[in-house]
A protein has these predicted regions:
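A basic, often C-terminal nucleic-acid-binding module that engages the phosphate backbone, implemented
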Residues: 209-258
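Intrinsically disordered, low-complexity, charged terminal extensions of DNA damage-control enzymes
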Residues: 29-82, 243-258
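Catalytic DNA-binding helix-loop module of base-excision-repair DNA glycosylases/AP lyases
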Residues: 162-207
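Ala/Thr-enriched low-complexity intrinsically disordered regions
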Residues: 7, 12, 17, 24-28, ...
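Alpha-helical ds-nucleic-acid-binding substructure associated with the helix-hairpin-helix region
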Residues: 63, 67, 95-96, 100-174, ...
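Short, positively charged low-complexity motifs
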Residues: 1-3, 15-21, 32
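Alpha-helical scaffold segments that form or flank carboxylate-/histidine-based iron centers
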Residues: 79-94
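Short helix-capping/linker segments at secondary-structure and domain boundaries
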Residues: 94-102, 149-153, 189-194, 241-249
Length: 258
């Protein structure tokens, strides 16, 4: 397992025991750290990249270079437990961020803070629905846990597999589409060459950066080729553009022709 996947697993109670007696730490560190532990079960890690990847992208694309210069290094958190990340993705489908947080909190309480295949297998679909999950989502999550327990899928094997092979395995699972699979590649496996055409924010970022009215699959593939082998890193800056997190004034001319 690559170094940045190693996580210090801390249960919320252990965090509280460590810093709860210190008023300053309790007021500042505990709310953030315990929230992250509560949701994901480990201390946070970040997608690993630096000057090498950024310099490559800046040389390849002057417009993207301008965004990188303004934004600086963008830190994105990693969630190396693929099982937990997939369950979280299924739970959050087609609901608001606020609703997802509420559902996930109750879900974690039901499982005693440990999102594992064994813990999910030990509860009923009715109990899962009681957390606010739809019947369909409850079924999908139970099936995912059972597949892991039965040895039908081995997330540990993904590290040695190509991106497309991982996607092919993930989309076989109920409730997991290509976009979710691509997000697992970036945010669980730390893969550096993913540009998700199915991501609306990526398309909006490309439109804003290059002046296109529409992003076709062929156009997205051309940009992917330009950014390769660091398309995931480029994606961070496209997301920032789409979300308005970085100011960028596109040159006043027609859309870029590539």
């Amino acid at each position: 397992m690559v170094e940045w996947f190693k996580a210090l697993v801390l249960k919320t109670s252990e965090v509280q025991a460590s810093v709860g007696s210190n008023p300053t730490l309790s007021a500042t560190i505990l709310p953030r750290l315990s929230r992250r532990v509560f949701y994901y079960g480990s201390a946070m890690l970040y997608f690993e990249y630096g000057e090498k990847e950024l310099n490559y992208l800046k040389k390849k694309d002057k417009r993207l270079a301008a965004v990188i210069e303004k934004a600086g290094v963008i830190q994105r958190e990693l969630y190396p437990d693929i099982f937990v990340s997939l369950v979280n993705s299924i739970a959050g489908q087609q609901i608001s961020r606020h609703a997802k947080a509420s559902v996930w909190r109750r879900f974690m309480e039901l499982l005693g803070g440990a999102v594992t295949p064994q813990a999910i297998d030990a509860v009923t679909e009715e109990q899962l629905r009681g957390c606010g999950l739809s019947g369909r989502k409850a079924v999908y999550i139970k099936r995912l846990a059972q597949k892991v327990l039965n040895g039908e899928i081995d997330f540990g094997a993904f590290a040695a597999m190509a991106d497309e092979e991982v996607i092919a395995e993930l989309i076989k699972l109920d409730g997991i589409g290509k976009w979710t699979a691509e997000m697992q590649l970036i945010f669980s496996l730390g893969r550096k060459n993913i540009l998700s055409f199915g991501d609306a924010a990526i398309q909006n970022g490309l439109k804003r950066l290059y002046g296109h009215k529409k992003i076709t699959l062929a156009l997205a593939e051309k940009y992917h080729k330009r950014y390769s082998p660091y398309a995931s890193v480029a994606s961070f800056y496209l997301w920032a553009l789409a979300n308005g997190d970085v100011e960028y004034e596109r040159p006043r001319r027609n859309a870029e022709k590539i």
